[in-house]
Amino acid sequence: MTQKNSKLCSRANVYTQVPDGGWGWVVAASFFFIEVFTYGVIKSFGVFFNDLMDSFDESNSKISWIISICVFIMTFTAPLSTILTNRFGHRLVVMGGGLLISVGMIAASFSQRVYQMYISIGIVSGLGYCFSFLPTVTILSQYFDKRRSMVTAVASTGECFAMFAFAPAITALKEHIGWRYSLLFVGLLQLNVMVCGALLRPIIIKGPGSPKAIPLEPRREVQYMLENEKTRTSIDSIDSGVELTTSPKNVPSEAKREQEVRVEQQQTLVVGPKHSQKRAPLLDFSILKDRSFICYTLFGLFATLGFFAPSLYIIPLGISLGIHPDRAAFLLSTMAIAEVFGRIGMGLVLNREPIRKIYIELICVILLTVSLFAFTFATEFWGLMLCSVFFGSMVGTIGGTHIPLLAEDDVVGIEKMSSAAGVYVFIQSISGLAGPPLAGLLVDQSKIYSRAFYSCAAGMALAAVCLALVRPCKKGLCQNPHSGENQTDGHRGKALQDIPEDFLEMDLGKCEPRAHMKMDPV
């Protein structure tokens, strides 16, 4: 009985439509705790800065490279994470990532030189962070549709609660056991990411009209079936138990469906290599032809400058202004609590229909830019407290939604989200590598910690400009009318009723003559 239940929990969930719940709630809980042990730890790493500077006798900018390399590897290897996820599934990739995170953090506790931390935390843990975070947020978006914004926003508050808990807890722990054993303890805690990864059951969405059908094979496969009507092939999926029979009576329906709807290849059912000779592309680079996506990736590139540095430098800034270290650590906790309210509030707003989510995001980016500039004018504890609350709430509105917004039709849509997320996070790697060292360089030259926030504010201002161009590009301001492809409208068409039809992902069933013209033999 136990073995049977274990097998059921490991198999894929098959739905006729996006469930907006079900096992998705377990996936959401897993995402919450993965956020705790990934971004939560990264954003709380500032509590170790002064200890590392004293132990290694290094400058602030050199210590900043630890997180810079970590963030760079985490974002630079995003396409690799996408490829491995499409090949081996979300569960194995996330569990492997959890192991890498823990190994890197534990190894860092034994480091004798700062460059050893560049390798352990920067490269090893950074790779693990990528393998753990990106597949989780992708599969969570597949389990939800109408509730996607709200669920993702609430689940992403894990990093906020981690910042609130870790900053004072690690500060107190260091006083009793030292920073090395504190790092070791954090590394052991991060093994829980493997448990969360084990709960990520794959999901398959199949049409309600064809209960035994899986997403279509490419057109060449349909042509092959038409030429070999006596061929009967069964494809069994170990995970889902779904069987596809290509008998002659099924071939016409498959051909008709090929004319009516074009399904993205990455959504096809994944089968074992010995069962299928044709695979969907592991990474779809066609999204790079979409100008709205290019603008959105530039937004992510510049916005990353303002995401990490404030949480790294708020404690040193407070100490430099004469604030006691315990009270300075409380600033980071306050920022985390404000971020919780920002994420939940943003989820409630974006969950309303109809609403243009990209515009709400733009308003929040502008306000976040203002909050970063405000840090440079703070001179005492309560001024920093006010800035921390403002910044935390604004970064919360963006931090929990900027990746899920890729699933919106204003950017790329849910079908291409897996590849888009990989490329998007990859582009962020440049500023993830340069951001903290640039801020640290400004601090080393001026000896004023508030200068670190100038580079963050400048990057966020550029991000606002790029985000403002996303919607005009999707409407056709910068669009080449011959660059797009017709795709299914499905449930997404209602969200873009005011966009010209040339730039809609249209239902080919309504344009049947055109579909027949495109069905050339391969």
From Swiss-Prot:
Record's keyword terms, sorted? Cell membrane, Membrane, Phosphoprotein, Transmembrane, Transmembrane helix, Transport
Which positions does the record annotate as the modified residue Phosphoserine?
Answer: S234, S237, S240, S247
Q: Offer one Pfam family short name for this entry.
A: MFS_1
Q: How does it sit in the membrane?
A: Multi-pass membrane protein
Q: Which GO terms describe its cellular component?
A: basolateral plasma membrane; plasma membrane
Instruction: Spell out the InterPro entries in the cross-references.
Output: MCT7, MFS, MFS_dom, MFS_trans_sf, Proton-linked_MCT
SUPFAM superfamilies assigned: MFS general substrate transporter
Tell me which domain of life the UniProt entry assigns to the organism this sequence originates from.
Eukaryota
Q: Which residues cross the membrane?
A: 22-42, 63-83, 92-112, 119-139, 150-170, 185-205, 299-319, 330-350, 358-378, 381-401, 423-443, 452-472
Catalytic activity entry: taurine(out) = taurine(in)
An example molecular function term from Gene Ontology annotations: monocarboxylic acid transmembrane transporter activity
Cytoplasmic topology ranges = 1-21, 84-91, 140-149, 206-298, 351-357, 402-422, 473-522
Q: Where in the cell is it found?
A: Basolateral cell membrane
Extracellular topology ranges: 43-62, 113-118, 171-184, 320-329, 379-380, 444-451
- Subunit (UniProt): Forms functional complexes with BSG/CD147 or EMB/GP70 ancillary proteins.
**What does it do?**
Monocarboxylate transporter selective for taurine. May associate with BSG/CD147 or EMB/GP70 ancillary proteins to mediate facilitative efflux or influx of taurine across the plasma membrane. The transport is pH- and sodium-independent. Rather low-affinity, is likely effective for taurine transport in tissues where taurine is present at high concentrations.
Name recorded for this polypeptide = Monocarboxylate transporter 7
Write down the species: Rattus norvegicus
- Identify the gene encoding this protein: Slc16a6
